[in-house]
Amino acid sequence: MSKSDLNLLVENIKFEHLNVFYDFVVSVLNALSISDFELSVILCDNAYIQELNNKFRNKNEPTDVLSFNYNEHNELNEDLVDGINYKIQGDLVISFEYLKFSAQEFNVEIYEELQRVTIHGILHLMGYKHETNDFQKEGMLILQENILKENKRVF
Protein backbone atom coordinates (compact mmCIF):
# COMPACT_ATOMS: atom_id res chain seq x y z
CA MET A 1 0.00 0.00 0.00
CA SER A 2 1.40 3.38 -0.99
CA LYS A 3 1.54 6.21 1.45
CA SER A 4 1.76 9.78 0.27
CA ASP A 5 2.52 12.36 2.92
CA LEU A 6 4.06 15.70 1.99
CA ASN A 7 4.46 18.53 4.49
CA LEU A 8 5.85 21.97 3.75
CA LEU A 9 7.02 24.08 6.67
CA VAL A 10 8.42 27.59 6.91
CA GLU A 11 10.84 28.61 9.70
CA ASN A 12 12.02 32.19 10.29
CA ILE A 13 11.29 33.45 6.75
CA LYS A 14 8.38 34.74 4.69
CA PHE A 15 7.40 32.54 1.78
CA GLU A 16 4.17 33.21 -0.06
CA HIS A 17 4.23 30.54 -2.77
CA LEU A 18 3.55 27.33 -0.84
CA ASN A 19 0.82 26.14 -3.23
CA VAL A 20 3.03 26.46 -6.32
CA PHE A 21 5.96 24.90 -4.45
CA TYR A 22 3.79 22.02 -3.24
CA ASP A 23 2.65 21.30 -6.82
CA PHE A 24 6.26 21.42 -7.98
CA VAL A 25 7.42 18.90 -5.34
CA VAL A 26 4.57 16.54 -6.26
CA SER A 27 5.49 16.80 -9.96
CA VAL A 28 9.12 15.90 -9.16
CA LEU A 29 8.05 12.90 -7.07
CA ASN A 30 5.83 11.75 -9.95
CA ALA A 31 8.63 12.26 -12.50
CA LEU A 32 10.86 10.03 -10.37
CA SER A 33 8.15 7.33 -9.96
CA ILE A 34 7.99 7.95 -6.22
CA SER A 35 4.47 7.04 -5.13
CA ASP A 36 5.27 5.95 -1.58
CA PHE A 37 6.69 8.82 0.44
CA GLU A 38 6.76 10.59 3.75
CA LEU A 39 8.50 13.87 3.06
CA SER A 40 8.79 17.14 4.92
CA VAL A 41 10.38 20.16 3.29
CA ILE A 42 11.41 22.97 5.63
CA LEU A 43 12.20 26.37 4.13
CA CYS A 44 14.27 28.38 6.58
CA ASP A 45 16.93 31.04 7.13
CA ASN A 46 20.70 30.63 7.39
CA ALA A 47 20.75 30.51 11.20
CA TYR A 48 18.31 27.59 11.27
CA ILE A 49 20.18 25.50 8.70
CA GLN A 50 23.58 26.40 10.17
CA GLU A 51 22.52 24.99 13.53
CA LEU A 52 21.48 21.71 11.87
CA ASN A 53 24.61 21.62 9.70
CA ASN A 54 26.76 22.05 12.81
CA LYS A 55 24.84 19.45 14.82
CA PHE A 56 24.69 16.71 12.17
CA ARG A 57 27.70 17.40 9.91
CA ASN A 58 30.08 19.29 12.24
CA LYS A 59 30.15 22.19 9.78
CA ASN A 60 29.42 25.46 11.56
CA GLU A 61 28.23 27.29 8.44
CA PRO A 62 25.04 27.66 6.48
CA THR A 63 24.43 25.59 3.36
CA ASP A 64 21.77 25.44 0.68
CA VAL A 65 20.10 22.09 1.43
CA LEU A 66 20.34 19.26 3.93
CA SER A 67 18.76 15.84 3.33
CA PHE A 68 17.82 13.62 6.25
CA ASN A 69 17.00 10.11 5.06
CA TYR A 70 14.96 8.01 7.50
CA ASN A 71 15.00 5.06 5.12
CA GLU A 72 18.78 4.64 5.29
CA HIS A 73 18.84 1.28 3.54
CA ASN A 74 17.99 3.07 0.27
CA GLU A 75 20.74 1.91 -2.06
CA LEU A 76 20.23 3.12 -5.57
CA ASN A 77 20.93 0.69 -8.36
CA GLU A 78 21.21 3.05 -11.33
CA ASP A 79 20.80 0.13 -13.76
CA LEU A 80 17.28 -0.40 -12.42
CA VAL A 81 16.09 3.21 -12.30
CA ASP A 82 13.41 2.98 -15.00
CA GLY A 83 10.11 1.44 -13.98
CA ILE A 84 10.82 1.14 -10.27
CA ASN A 85 8.68 2.75 -7.62
CA TYR A 86 10.90 4.13 -4.89
CA LYS A 87 9.90 4.73 -1.31
CA ILE A 88 11.38 7.72 0.44
CA GLN A 89 11.09 8.85 4.02
CA GLY A 90 12.92 11.96 5.05
CA ASP A 91 13.24 15.66 5.53
CA LEU A 92 14.72 18.32 3.31
CA VAL A 93 15.84 21.54 4.95
CA ILE A 94 16.43 24.38 2.50
CA SER A 95 17.81 27.80 3.40
CA PHE A 96 15.88 30.26 1.27
CA GLU A 97 18.23 32.96 2.57
CA TYR A 98 21.26 31.00 1.29
CA LEU A 99 19.57 30.54 -2.09
CA LYS A 100 19.51 34.31 -2.55
CA PHE A 101 23.32 34.20 -2.52
CA SER A 102 23.71 31.11 -4.71
CA ALA A 103 21.11 32.33 -7.24
CA GLN A 104 23.16 35.52 -7.65
CA GLU A 105 26.38 33.53 -7.90
CA PHE A 106 24.97 31.25 -10.63
CA ASN A 107 23.05 34.08 -12.31
CA VAL A 108 19.65 32.37 -12.03
CA GLU A 109 16.33 33.39 -10.52
CA ILE A 110 15.91 32.41 -6.85
CA TYR A 111 12.85 30.23 -7.51
CA GLU A 112 14.76 28.29 -10.16
CA GLU A 113 17.51 27.66 -7.62
CA LEU A 114 14.89 26.59 -5.05
CA GLN A 115 13.54 24.05 -7.51
CA ARG A 116 17.05 22.83 -8.38
CA VAL A 117 18.09 22.20 -4.75
CA THR A 118 14.73 20.56 -4.00
CA ILE A 119 15.30 18.06 -6.80
CA HIS A 120 18.89 17.62 -5.60
CA GLY A 121 17.72 16.79 -2.08
CA ILE A 122 15.07 14.34 -3.28
CA LEU A 123 17.66 12.54 -5.42
CA HIS A 124 19.89 12.18 -2.35
CA LEU A 125 16.93 10.72 -0.44
CA MET A 126 16.59 8.15 -3.24
CA GLY A 127 20.21 7.14 -2.76
CA TYR A 128 21.85 9.11 -5.57
CA LYS A 129 25.36 10.39 -4.89
CA HIS A 130 27.84 12.59 -6.74
CA GLU A 131 31.58 13.02 -6.35
CA THR A 132 31.87 16.41 -8.05
CA ASN A 133 29.65 19.29 -9.07
CA ASP A 134 30.28 18.68 -12.78
CA PHE A 135 26.92 19.18 -14.48
CA GLN A 136 28.31 17.66 -17.71
CA LYS A 137 29.57 14.36 -16.27
CA GLU A 138 27.79 13.53 -13.00
CA GLY A 139 24.76 11.34 -13.69
CA MET A 140 22.87 12.66 -10.68
CA LEU A 141 23.35 16.28 -11.72
CA ILE A 142 22.42 15.58 -15.33
CA LEU A 143 19.22 13.91 -14.14
CA GLN A 144 18.57 16.83 -11.79
CA GLU A 145 18.78 19.34 -14.64
CA ASN A 146 16.57 17.22 -16.91
CA ILE A 147 13.90 16.96 -14.21
CA LEU A 148 14.12 20.71 -13.64
CA LYS A 149 13.68 21.36 -17.36
CA GLU A 150 10.58 19.14 -17.50
CA ASN A 151 8.92 20.31 -14.25
CA LYS A 152 9.98 23.93 -13.75
CA ARG A 153 7.30 26.22 -12.34
CA VAL A 154 6.83 29.97 -12.46
CA PHE A 155 6.37 31.49 -9.01
From Swiss-Prot:
Query: Which cofactor does this sequence's record say it needs?
Result: Zn(2+)
- In Pfam terms, one family for this protein is YbeY
The annotation note on the cofactor reads: Binds 1 zinc ion.
Name the keywords, alphabetized: Cytoplasm, Endonuclease, Hydrolase, Metal-binding, Nuclease, Ribosome biogenesis, rRNA processing, Zinc
Protein name, as recorded: Endoribonuclease YbeY
Please provide, in alphabetical order, the Gene Ontology terms of the cellular component aspect for this entry. Answer: cytoplasm
The family line of this record is: Belongs to the endoribonuclease YbeY family.
The UniProt record lists the EC number as 3.1.-.-
PROSITE patterns from the xrefs?
Answer: UPF0054
Q: Which domain of life is it from?
A: Bacteria
Lineage, highest ranks first: Bacteria, Pseudomonadati, Spirochaetota, Spirochaetia, Spirochaetales
Give the species this sequence originates from.
Borreliella burgdorferi (strain ATCC 35210 / DSM 4680 / CIP 102532 / B31)
